[in-house]
Amino acid sequence: MISTDQRLTHTSCVYNRLMQERALIDQLQREGFANAYVWEDTPHARYPDHTHRRETAHVILSGELTLTMNGESKTYRAGERCDVPANAVHSARIGSHGCRYLIAER
């Protein structure tokens, strides 16, 4: 059964850009996220509607990523993070300069 509370969670604090990727991965692990890795997409890449079995965190390192869920779209840029709930149908669109981000799940 899919949770009725399927909204994107936006963390408004801007991550310190000097923080190393390792420190960001460590932070995600402290929050209970696992399998963290860096992913890089080419400009204008698109991911059609899909789901993940587990909650997924995305920490944008460079570029931008637009996520759409329940008809709501939000663009995330370097230093921002969004969490997508488990089993939430969503799509993603990458910006004109590509996107490099950490992704992890719990």
Where do the model's predicted regions map?
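A short, N-terminal "cap"/entry segment at the start of jelly-roll beta-barrel domains
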Residues: 1-40, 46-48
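Short histidine-centered beta-strand/loop micro-motifs
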Residues: 27, 46-52, 69, 93-94
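Histidine-centered metal-chelating micro-motifs
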Residues: 46-47, 81-82, 86-91
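Short, conserved beta-strand element in jelly-roll/cupin
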Residues: 51-67
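Short acidic-glycine-tyrosine-enriched beta hairpin
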Residues: 70-86
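Ligand-binding loop in jelly-roll beta-barrel domains
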Residues: 86-106
